[in-house]
């Protein structure tokens, strides 16, 4: 009897310990969310260790309350009359503390920058060197008459300042249950939000040197990407900086956003090569009254349309290499579509994406006649928080927010998104190489 009592007491103690441990573990799980994945494509962990590769780290410690930082100094500049001064000041704001650390926010000692989560997922998802995502193919002649290489592509990474990061954090407050409606409820991003994106070209170095003169003296990054945009396979390649986009939430603009673009020109020969990105132009509307159908898909020179009232293009031909721009001379960068515009694509951002971001990108709309009423739906001056489609939530000109939410929905169906965890340095010894893509061992 005594022995049974001792065994019973022992069993109760063990059971109590198990229940206590389970309760503590459960509370820890509920109080602390798993971080968002950093990336979705990379060489194997063994190669990362062997070569001491610095991995991309998603900046995701989003502000919990709206930052009280003052508006940047460039808000004092007239963005129409002094457009170039404005763009140079924006560029400096984006570059401070970033250019000397390869744009790794965790190393920036000047100001905080954040990334959009859920860009890691899918075939086009983030790679692990710099967080670049696969964006768009580059057609023959798109970068100039001498460009004959046909399989290159655009790879990009974007950054948001503290006010932009605050909005991202509100939408993604629950990592497993993002709330798109908060975008609309909050009126989108607050004034003072600054977003910028660096775009790189995937093309072999010797080809770039021969075919794209303004990319000589280029700035190159390592990336887990490829030189054939149509291929899903990846390998370690060199990609070259070619473009920078900026978006500034500024209520002086009719829509609420000012959009700018920069193009790389190695002949500028700045000691900090990032500053070889020269202002291409600025826009604050889409000139909806202008329906003339012209484009310049293979640029021998930059066509500047004097009739546009809401786009300004850099007229300095010594500074700006020939550029195709957008439809009828609207602002668009070298890696963008010559039949669209910066404003056009971003104004269609919504979740779910019921309409394509360009009438060219869907069989139902690709036959619209340029300049027709159907076509011009994509070239209106929409308020940044208005709905492009009924039944969708506007994401305030943020294509990345719309894409991130859609990626999360797609993942919920497949539950396939834990690949990045094998790159947790502390866990290397516990995991085998689990890369789902081509590996370099």
Which residue ranges define each predicted feature?
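N-terminal Sec-pathway targeting helices
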Residues: 1-13
